[in-house]
């Protein structure tokens, strides 16, 4: 009999809109390859841009927040594993799953550490340097509590794994490193890449709904591009991204060679035509899908330490990492103009992509899941903090949810 996996999503997967959507599709494909029976449930409205998961044999299920109908649904389904897409979903539905399906393995996929991203954002807003103490926020208390309550939490960044272990004192036994999974390019795909001479202009891409992306576009427009366009009078800046608001479209300026292109049907295609991917991210967390895509098509990247964080560890970066405005401008100019440097960055990208090869991670991850399923009782007994937080969550969250439910009737 097939094992059942229930995924509770924040939104419907949109791999062409965000890296989070691509990540979710990777997880679905991973479990589908094991012939699991998968149900994807979310409380958000259907989207015309969502991936047709039904074509993969995945059941799509609409659910409601703060409603007993979910309890009935999950009790009837009786999944062996429930995967929560970000900590907010675990907060909303974790206690209901624990009550209706106490033997189900509960896995949290963080995507990125929200508390880290928000703390860095606050430091940028306040025009100061980020400090580790900034992490002691209400968001961190919620997110770390969610990690403790879950049987296993998936992390995509080595930096964030280290932060959880060393700063938040999260036991190694309840967190697991599973980054973006990359399939190697074929010789045919590699041979089709445009050469240095065949490429032109700078490009960046990312959902405008993701605050670090929107901030980096404004930063490009106001601080980086005015200097860079003076250095490279023929180069253009092409900005792609899903859900561009009107205020983003207003940044479009042909005279300044700054083009807001909006939605890209194929991220890799637009990145492949550019000579350099330029994304000066001032805050953020997790891994950046734009750089994986850029590396895959051989487009070197200029970014900040935050942009490259967790992506290359001890390997040389696939381009140049710079922090200050003038350094970023110089880096972009050098990489755009120097063919030898550009070719070297391409070679570095190949090594980085190899470190994300799916064959390095999938089998070990599935082995870990099976071991946890077989030893779930012992695993939970060793995580007293998690069981204590779940106990209090089931009380406080449940009563709040019941109150909202009663109020809505």
Please give the residue ranges for each predicted region.
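C-terminal amphipathic helix plus adjacent low-complexity
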Residues: 343, 348-409
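Acceptor-binding helix/loop patch of EC 2.4 sugar-transfer enzymes
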Residues: 14, 103-137, 197, 207
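N-terminal subdomain of nucleotide-sugar transferases
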Residues: 1-50
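Short hydrophobic beta-strand element within catalytic cores of glycosyltransferases
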Residues: 290-293, 300-304
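Acidic donor-binding loop of glycosyltransferase active sites
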Residues: 79-80, 272-286, 299
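A short, active-site helix/loop in glycosyltransferases that binds the activated sugar's phosphate group
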Residues: 92-93, 140-172, 248
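Conserved catalytic-core segment of nucleotide-activated headgroup transferases in glycan assembly
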Residues: 166-170, 175-273
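Conserved acidic donor-binding segment of nucleotide-sugar-dependent glycosyltransferases
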Residues: 318-326, 334-339
């Amino acid at each position: 009999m097939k094992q059942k996996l229930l995924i509770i999503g924040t939104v419907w997967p949109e791999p062409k809109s965000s890296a989070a959507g691509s990540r979710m599709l990777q997880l679905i494909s991973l479990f589908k390859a094991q012939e699991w029976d998968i149900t994807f449930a979310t409380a958000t409205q259907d989207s015309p841009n969502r991936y047709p998961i039904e074509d993969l044999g995945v059941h799509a299920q609409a659910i409601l927040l703060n409603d007993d109908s979910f309890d009935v649904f999950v009790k009837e389904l009786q999944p062996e594993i429930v995967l929560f897409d970000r900590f907010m979903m675990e907060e909303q539905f974790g206690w209901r799953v624990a009550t209706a399906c106490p033997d189900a393995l509960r896995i949290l996929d963080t995507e990125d550490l929200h508390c880290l991203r928000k703390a860095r954002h606050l430091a940028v807003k306040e025009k100061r340097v980020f400090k580790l103490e900034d992490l002691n926020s209400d968001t961190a208390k919620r997110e770390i509590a969610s990690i403790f309550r879950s049987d296993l939490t998936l992390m995509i960044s080595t930096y964030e794994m280290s932060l959880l272990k060393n700063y938040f004192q999260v036991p190694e036994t309840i967190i697991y490193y599973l980054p973006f999974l990359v399939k190697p390019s074929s010789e045919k795909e590699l041979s089709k890449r445009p050469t240095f001479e065949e490429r032109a202009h700078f490009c960046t891409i990312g959902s405008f709904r993701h605050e670090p992306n929107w901030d980096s576009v404004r930063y490009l427009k106001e601080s980086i591009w005015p200097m860079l366009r003076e250095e490279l009078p023929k180069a253009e800046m092409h900005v792609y991204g899903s859900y561009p608001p009107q205020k983003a479209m207003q940044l479009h300026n042909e005279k300044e060679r700054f083009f807001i292109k909006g939605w890209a049907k194929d991220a890799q295609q637009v990145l492949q035509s550019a000579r350099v991917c330029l994304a000066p991210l001032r805050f953020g967390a997790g891994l950046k899908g734009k750089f994986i895509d850029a590396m895959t098509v051989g487009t070197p990247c200029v970014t900040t330490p935050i942009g490259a964080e967790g992506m290359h560890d001890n390997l040389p970066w696939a381009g140049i990492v710079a922090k200050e405005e003038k350094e970023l401008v110089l880096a972009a100019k050098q990489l755009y103009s120097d063919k030898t440097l550009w070719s070297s960055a391409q070679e570095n990208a190949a090594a980085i992509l190899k470190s994300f090869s799916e064959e390095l991670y999938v089998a070990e991850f599935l082995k870990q899941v099976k071991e946890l399923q077989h030893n779930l009782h012992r695993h939970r007994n060793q995580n007293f903090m998690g069981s204590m937080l779940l106990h209090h969550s089931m009380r406080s969250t449940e009563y709040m949810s019941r109150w909202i439910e009663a109020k809505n009737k």
